[in-house]
């Protein structure tokens, strides 16, 4: 099996834009609400929920921790809805995404999310399942429920991608 190394990039709104949204207060539109006692950081992600008998779900995912090296052997995507991950424990995590290459994902990109950043994968974006770092971590996950199957998986058969370090380049 051929293995190609991925370089970890810092998670920024600009770099992540083709794949979805970085959920963070930095640069967000601020509105004071509740008679000025609460700061609302407005419209942080573009949530999508298409299909039949659709609704938005809120879940808590508890992700097992990973340590480098991490082999990326598969990716998944959700054709009917976006999926957002917001860390609840303030710990960093890895985000691995790829554009569509027609018959599956293109070469993935890896990002290091700080513990105060979340991500929203847009509909049909290839991504690796949750990669918590340091220790088991909880994430608030905004997802889509509906009648249609909202999961497609792709397994790399002749090659894999490896993350040698969880530090950014």
UniProtKB/Swiss-Prot annotation:
Pfam families according to UniProt: Ureidogly_lyase
Recorded catalytic activity of this chain's protein: (S)-ureidoglycolate = urea + glyoxylate
Record GO terms (molecular function): ureidoglycolate hydrolase activity; ureidoglycolate lyase activity
E.C. code: 4.3.2.3
Gene3D superfamilies in the record: Ureidoglycolate hydrolase
Pathway assigned to this chain's UniProt record: Nitrogen metabolism; (S)-allantoin degradation
Entry keywords, A to Z: Lyase, Purine metabolism
Domain of life: Bacteria
Keyword match Iron-sulfur: no
Subunit structure: Homodimer.
Protein name (Swiss-Prot/TrEMBL): Ureidoglycolate lyase
């Amino acid at each position: 099996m051929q293995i190609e190394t991925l370089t970890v990039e810092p998670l920024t709104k600009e770099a992540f834009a083709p794949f979805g949204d970085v959920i963070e207060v930095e640069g967000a539109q601020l509105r004071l609400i509740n008679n000025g006692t609460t700061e609302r950081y407005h419209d942080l992600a573009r949530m999508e929920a298409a299909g039949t008998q659709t609704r938005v779900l809120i879940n808590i995912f508890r992700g097992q921790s990973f340590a480098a090296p991490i082999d990326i052997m598969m990716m998944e995507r959700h054709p009917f809805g976006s999926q957002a991950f917001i860390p609840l424990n303030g710990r960093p995590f890895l985000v691995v995404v790829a554009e569509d290459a027609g018959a599956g994902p293109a070469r993935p990109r890896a990002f290091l999310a700080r513990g105060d950043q979340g991500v929203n994968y847009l509909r049909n974006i290839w991504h690796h399942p949750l990669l918590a770092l340091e220790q088991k971590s909880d994430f608030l996950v905004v997802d889509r429920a509906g009648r249609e199957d909202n999961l497609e998986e792709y397994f790399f058969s002749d090659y894999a991608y490896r993350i040698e370090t969880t530090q950014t380049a």
